[in-house]
């Protein structure tokens, strides 16, 4: 019948005119609907008992021809109004996950530095030299003095450029013309931008000398504090100890002489200054230790911040009488603070700190055995080395796995994602969905041959309408009879349904 079909078709397909026409239309359009399949079966007068087999053969042919079988969204029509049809029918379509709208933030453009409100000739010489700035303030008195101050500032700018002492982040763009305003105002250290976007703050303040890299700015700031030698560390530690003693005296003593109280307050304040000095002089030690833990789930600045907390603890606990350098003592506190923070914050799924230590120990032993044996050690070998059971080793290895994002790009171009390769276990196969729709229609046609009460009892007992089976007591309350009477009706109805005249239509759907 179909000249385009080279393979031998099953007789139930080849003898059906409407089904063959449906296949040809599917080849042309690339897809067919489930309702069209049902209408084709009815047009060719295919017995309902053969629908399952014919659908199976049809689905195989469509897969070979590359035709998609679409599931109809419409629910089957019901010819009888059932008593149990109070709750909505069970939906068979898959759940559609609503995509959350992603709002893109406008990237606020950095404020362009506005020209300071001074004469253009004196702008370039204002930043480098403090003495030139002082001369500029005196230059307001007379025009001749102003000219002299400009020349002196220009000479100092040239000298500092030759010595290489200019700031790295000096603006290279030509300053824009601006209206004159008196120097030395409150906004002298800020650059205000008037070209703000609607969603940006009304004013944008840019710190002088700041860059777009916060790590670089931080390293630049802590690099200004000179390092300490051993004698200076001991001296600062003594001042810190005296300050802590003075704070304790002030807190626990109710009645102190005014003179003694003032002296204790001075000593306590001096101890706080010494503590800050010791902290600031050792911030570079934290950076050097934090570099060893980069790439393990935390940002570099976060590692530095956690290490600074450990440094504060080390300053408070340092005992200069032991004779050790402060850096030797502080290293352990900094390292502990960083590792504890990584164990608590680095993972997407938090793992307790004690379990993280077990995971790290297992990883170290596994690397060592890999070098010794030249192969991956078995769980039994690891268990013997770690003094634990093989089951426990496998469990700890599972805890150490890192989750992978479904949006991880694959390939060199990154045109596909990892989630594209994961099978959706809840997805409904189109052929099964069409088969289920046909089963529902046949089931309702069989229930139509029963009385209204019998059909209602069976529907509620097996949850044919809402997917929630009901007990005999619940059905009895609906019909106002006892649970025993409902059991009798159910038994009688099931006997009727087992008769070949009714069961033969549904039996083909069991496999």
From Swiss-Prot:
Chain residue ranges for the region called Sigma-70 factor domain-3: 357-433
Sequence segments annotated as region (Disordered): 72-186
PANTHER family: RNA POLYMERASE PRINCIPAL SIGMA FACTOR HRDA (PTHR30603:SF59), RNA POLYMERASE SIGMA FACTOR RPO (PTHR30603)
Similarity comment: Belongs to the sigma-70 factor family.
GO CC term (a single one): cytoplasm
Region (Sigma-70 factor domain-2): 278-348
Keyword terms: DNA-binding, Sigma factor, Transcription, Transcription regulation
Region listing for Binds RNA polymerase-binding protein RbpA, in residue ranges: 211-347
Annotated region of DNA binding: 472-491
Cited InterPro entries: RNA_pol_sigma-70_dom (IPR014284), RNA_pol_sigma70 (IPR000943), RNA_pol_sigma70_r1_2 (IPR009042), RNA_pol_sigma70_r2 (IPR007627), RNA_pol_sigma70_r3 (IPR007624), RNA_pol_sigma70_r4 (IPR007630), RNA_pol_sigma_r2 (IPR013325), RNA_pol_sigma_r3/r4-like (IPR013324)
Role, per record: Sigma factors are initiation factors that promote the attachment of RNA polymerase to specific initiation sites and are then released. This sigma factor is the primary sigma factor during exponential growth. Its activity is stimulated by RbpA.
Region (Sigma-70 factor domain-4): 446-499
Gene Ontology BP terms: DNA-templated transcription initiation
Keyword Repressor recorded: no
Entries under PROSITE patterns matching the protein: SIGMA70_1 (PS00715), SIGMA70_2 (PS00716)
Keyword Mitochondrion: no
This protein's name: RNA polymerase principal sigma factor HrdB
Organism: Streptomyces coelicolor (strain ATCC BAA-471 / A3(2) / M145)
Motif (Interaction with polymerase core subunit RpoC) on chain: 302-305
Low complexity: compositionally biased ranges: 94-121
Pfam families from the UniProt entry: Sigma70_r1_2, Sigma70_r2, Sigma70_r3, Sigma70_r4
Biased composition (Basic residues): 78-93, 132-158
GO molecular function: bacterial-type RNA polymerase holo enzyme binding; DNA binding; sigma factor activity
Subunit structure: Homotrimer (Potential). interacts transiently with the RNA polymerase core complex. Interacts with RNA polymerase-binding protein RbpA via its sigma-2 region (residues 211-347) in a free form.
